[in-house]
A protein has these predicted regions:
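Macrodomain-like recognition of ADP-ribose-binding/processing modules
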Residues: 1-45
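Acidic, surface-exposed loops and disordered segments
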Residues: 46-257
């Protein structure tokens, strides 16, 4: 009996491009006389914009292990993120306690894999956590996973992470295979969060529309994008609003991606 195991893999793994990987899988499938599901090709060919559109916050997860190739892709990008962003992000797997406490009761279930978003204390740490954390979230989406940012709905489990004396944890990000792909929540309009108009470039409006799809704390969307123009490179300014909930600096970093 021939078993042909296929798991979705991300873009750019080991220097391969999607258009190079896809024919290899197609040829292997033909030799094995199997038909790859449409969902496989959808994940394999997912672009950054596809990931932005399909990403929704998911809080309930299946009891399903992350494949080795998915873990390797995540760990590789975490290493890049830590180096570029001067962070100390850590991946924790097969650990069910962090999201099982009273803070997560009724909100999360089945979470066994998550990112500990940490770094050296500084004025811009939250913003960097947001920017690079969302980069990991979109990679997870392209790998066929789901995710959810968590500001307080978790507990720190001793022995699952390490911190230097001058570092702190800003938040966690749950990742895994969701029970559902999630749903799009109510959003503000382009005019609510920007100065987009018929006079501003189309790329700016599209950028604002993408920003409105980004996760923010309790969907508060307390940011404003302003097209300033300028040559040779046009400038865009982002400002954060006032929030009793907080996390606006982290939200701003997420939106910047």
């Amino acid at each position: 009996a021939l078993t042909f195991l296929v798991t979705p893999i991300g873009c750019g793994i080991a220097g391969w491009r999607v258009e190079e990987i896809a024919p290899l899988f197609g040829a292997a499938a033909e030799l094995a006389n199997v038909t790859l599901p449409e969902s496989f090709w959808k994940v394999l060919k997912m672009s950054d914009m596809d990931a932005v559109i399909s990403r929704h916050s998911v809080r309930r997860y299946l009891d399903r292990k992350l494949p080795v190739n998915v873990l390797n892709s995540l760990r590789s990008e975490i290493a890049n993120v830590n180096a570029e962003g001067n962070l100390h992000v850590q991946l924790v797997t097969d650990e069910p306690l962090a999201f099982s406490g009273v803070m997560a009761y009724g909100k999360f279930s089945g979470v066994k894999n998550y990112l500990v978003m940490a770094g050296r204390k500084s004025a811009d740490l939250d913003e960097r956590i947001g920017y690079y954390g969302e980069r990991l979230v979109l990679l997870a989406q392209r790998l066929g996973l789901n995710s959810c940012w968590a500001g307080i709905s978790y507990r720190k489990v001793f022995g699952t992470y390490s911190l230097e004396p001058d570092e702190k944890i800003c938040c966690y990000i749950a990742i895994g295979y969701g029970e559902t792909p999630g749903v799009q929540h109510k959003s503000k309009s382009v005019n609510d969060v920007s100065n987009a108009s018929p006079q501003t470039p189309d790329w700016f409006r599209k950028g604002v529309e993408s920003a409105l799809l980004a996760p923010t704390a309790v969907n508060q969307q307390k940011f404003f994008l302003e097209f300033l123009g300028g040559e040779p490179l046009p400038q865009v300014r982002i400002t954060r609003g006032v929030s009793l909930i907080g996390y606006t600096r982290m939200d701003m970093g997420i939106v910047k991606l």
